[in-house]
């Protein structure tokens, strides 16, 4: 009986120990889940973008990736190429100066660098701004300074939209220029055709027997002839001639006899 009682007590003790162990595991599980959730929150990283305002000649995305990778993980890099007009102008200036073409014919004006962590991007932009690009003495970018700016709340999708908008504006400007050039060409061709028809109708001015015809304003004699040709115009013309002769005779008599003209005598008191 004693042995049976001891066995029962041992079984009860074992069952109590198992229950305590399960309760302890149940208490540890929410703590583990809380730790895992906090670790996930800590591991959530937001990327940041740094704007590169100055890109020296022969500076490529590979160079900026190699230089900035020492401070943090670098993601995507994009450089904006210079305009084709500027590129052609540089080539023309180099050809006029007798210089050989550069090995790297393509240069860039600005760039964007994406860091995996925005905190690293802020730190890099704050620490490297206005500092030399190249640390070595033989570096070709030693005398160029970093021009960095952290873009707050700026994502890569914003950059893609901005570049797409610029491309659309460039296409619209190109279409407008092409339309303007077409209008000017059509206007020139129309003028050429009109000139050819004009020369064919009136003759070529370069030939000695040809002549140009132009409509001019009629003279005073032509005006009088037209008025006289109208009904009653001859009588009016005769009366006008008589009045002119009388006016001239009156002035001649006044000069001979020294008498004032009738109009002058009326005006004087």
UniProtKB/Swiss-Prot annotation:
Domain RRM positions: 48-145
Entries under InterPro entries matching the protein: ABT1/Esf2, ABT1/ESF2_RRM, Nucleotide-bd_a/b_plait_sf, RBD_domain_sf
Residue ranges the record marks as coiled coil: 5-29, 164-194
One GO term (biological process): spinal cord motor neuron differentiation
Self-association and partners: Interacts with ESF1/ABTAP. Interacts with IGHMBP2.
Keyword annotations from UniProtKB, A to Z: Coiled coil, DNA-binding, Nucleus, RNA-binding, Transcription, Transcription regulation
Family: Belongs to the ESF2/ABP1 family.
Biased composition (Acidic residues): 16-32
Record-linked Gene3D superfamilies: 3.30.70.330
Region of interest called Disordered, as start-end residue ranges on this chain: 1-40, 220-244
Protein name, per record: Activator of basal transcription 1
Source organism superkingdom: Eukaryota
Subcellular location: Nucleus; Nucleus, Nucleolus
Molecular-function GO terms, alphabetical: DNA binding; RNA binding
Entries under PANTHER family matching the protein: ACTIVATOR OF BASAL TRANSCRIPTION 1 (PTHR12311:SF7)
Tissue expression remark: Ubiquitously expressed.
Function: Could be a novel TATA-binding protein (TBP) which can function as a basal transcription activator. Can act as a regulator of basal transcription for class II genes.
């Amino acid at each position: 009986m004693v042995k049976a009682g001891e066995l029962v007590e041992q079984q009860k003790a074992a069952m109590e120990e198992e229950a305590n162990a399960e309760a302890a595991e149940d208490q540890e599980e929410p703590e583990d889940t809380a730790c895992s959730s906090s670790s996930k929150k800590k591991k959530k990283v937001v990327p940041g973008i740094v704007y590169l305002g100055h890109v020296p000649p022969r500076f490529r995305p590979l160079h900026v990736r190699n230089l900035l990778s020492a401070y943090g993980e670098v993601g995507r890099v994009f450089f904006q190429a210079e305009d084709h007009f500027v590129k052609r102008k540089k080539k023309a200036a180099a050809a006029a100066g007798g210089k050989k073409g550069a090995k790297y014919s393509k240069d860039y004006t600005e760039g964007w660098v994406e860091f995996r962590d925005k905190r690293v991007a802020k730190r890099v932009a704050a620490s490297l701004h206005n500092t030399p690009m190249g640390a070595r003495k033989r570096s070709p970018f030693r005398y160029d300074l970093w021009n960095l700016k952290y873009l707050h709340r700026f994502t890569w999708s914003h950059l893609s939209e901005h570049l797409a908008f610029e491309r659309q504006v460039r296409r619209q400007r190109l279409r407008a220029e092409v339309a303007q050039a077409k209008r000017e060409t059509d206007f020139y061709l129309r003028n050429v055709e009109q000139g050819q028809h004009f020369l064919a109708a009136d003759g070529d001015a370069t030939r000695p027997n040809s002549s140009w015809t132009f409509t001019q304003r009629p003279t005073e004699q032509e005006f009088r002839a037209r008025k006289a040709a109208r009904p009653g115009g001859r009588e009016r013309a005769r009366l006008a001639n008589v009045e002119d002769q009388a006016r001239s005779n009156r002035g001649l008599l006044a000069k001979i006899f020294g008498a004032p003209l009738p109009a002058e005598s009326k005006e004087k008191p």
